[in-house]
Every structure is written in C-alpha cells, then in structure tokens.
Design a protein with these regions (language model features):
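Extracellular/periplasmic catalytic domains that process cell-envelope and extracellular macromolecules
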Residues: 7-11, 64-67, 124-126
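Proteins synthesized as precursors that undergo proteolytic processing into mature forms
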Residues: 103-105, 114-121
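Second-shell loop/turn segments in exported
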Residues: 1-5, 14, 61, 91-99, ...
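Peptidoglycan-targeting cell-wall enzymes and recognition modules
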Residues: 17-111
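Export/targeting segments at the very N-terminus of extracytoplasmic proteins
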Residues: 1-20, 24-25
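Solvent-exposed, polar/charged alpha-helical surfaces in well-ordered, non-transmembrane soluble domains
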Residues: 13-16, 72, 106, 110, ...
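Low-complexity, Gly/Ser/Thr/Pro-rich intrinsically disordered linker/tail segments
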Residues: 132-163
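Acidic helix/loop microenvironments that form the catalytic cleft of cell-wall polysaccharide enzymes
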Residues: 19-22, 121-143
C-alpha cells in the first residue's frame, strides 16, 4: 500500500472498505457475474476491434474476458490495458493474473492512485470514494453506490481497528 500512498488511517480504512466489498470480503478475486453485460460497453473499450480480436482468440467475448478481476474488480479492456501499461503485468492477454494476490493488490492500489481516491479519503468522503470505485464518477446522491451500506460498515469497522 505504500507504493500508492495508501498510508494514513483514513486512506487505509477507505481502501480496505472498497476492496473488502468488491471482493466479497476477500473471497472472490474474479467477478461472479458472467461479464456478458459488459460486451457492448464502448466506455470500457469492449467494442474496440482489438478487444474483440483478443477475446475471440481466447474463445470468449470482451465482456466475459475482461469482467472484474482482482480485489477492486478491474473491468473492461481499457482498464486492463491501462493497468498492464502501469504495472507491467500482461493482464490484457491474461486478465486472471489480477486474481493473484500481488498483482491484484497492486492493481487495486494503481486504480486508487489514478482515480485520485486519496483526496476523498483524506476528508472522510466514503460516499465519494464508493461512487468513484463503483460508478466511475461522483454522484449527487449520497449512498447510491452498489453495496454502499456494506462499504460504509467496513469503513467504520476499519477506522475502529486502525490506530
């Protein structure tokens, strides 16, 4: 976590709450859903001809091939590509590499860093952190991220434990 400056009580609590929720409290390093819902998501790069080619070469479709991986659930061709370029791990051709603890945790830290989540964590904005992880943007509504109640409970529990 030091590599990505997840190094204060508020940052650690926020980070753990998000990866705790996204991974089913560290039980699942690959999204449980099939990923088919992501097949036509241009915002994830899954309609890119190269994405379609790579997925097909692996007997899959883009949504299924690049469904959520790792404790923060890196999702989609473009996110796997960006993670690969940043971390030097070929999670484009081998997305399940992010299911391995070292690669997955580094990918989660990278995601945290590139999305500026420390800024929100530093002011205790667990709603903003949750929105950015789950929705990709801050929303006006409070608590509308998927699983917000669990994210908040995990955050509160982490704050009590971390001194």
């Amino acid at each position: 976590m030091q590599e990505f400056a997840i190094d204060t009580r508020l940052r650690v609590a926020a980070f753990l709450s998000q990866i705790g929720h996204e991974s089913g409290q560290f039980r699942f390093m690959e999204e449980l859903a099939s990923g088919a819902a992501y097949d036509h998501r241009a915002d994830l790069g899954n309609t890119n001809p190269e994405a379609i080619r790579i997925a097909a070469a692996n007997g899959s479709t883009p949504g299924r091939f690049w469904k959520g991986h790792g404790p923060i659930q890196i999702t989609g061709y473009l996110n796997h590509l960006a993670a690969m370029m940043a971390l030097h791990v070929d999670c484009v051709e081998q997305p399940r590499l992010l299911c391995e603890p070292v690669h997955g945790c580094r990918a989660a830290g990278w995601f945290w860093s590139v999305n500026g989540l420390a800024k929100r964590a530093d002011v205790g904005d667990i709603d903003g952190v949750s929105d950015l992880v789950n929705r990709g943007k801050k929303t006006a509504a409070i608590g509308d991220a998927n699983g917000f109640a669990e994210r908040k409970a995990l955050y509160d529990r982490a704050l009590k434990v971390i001194s």
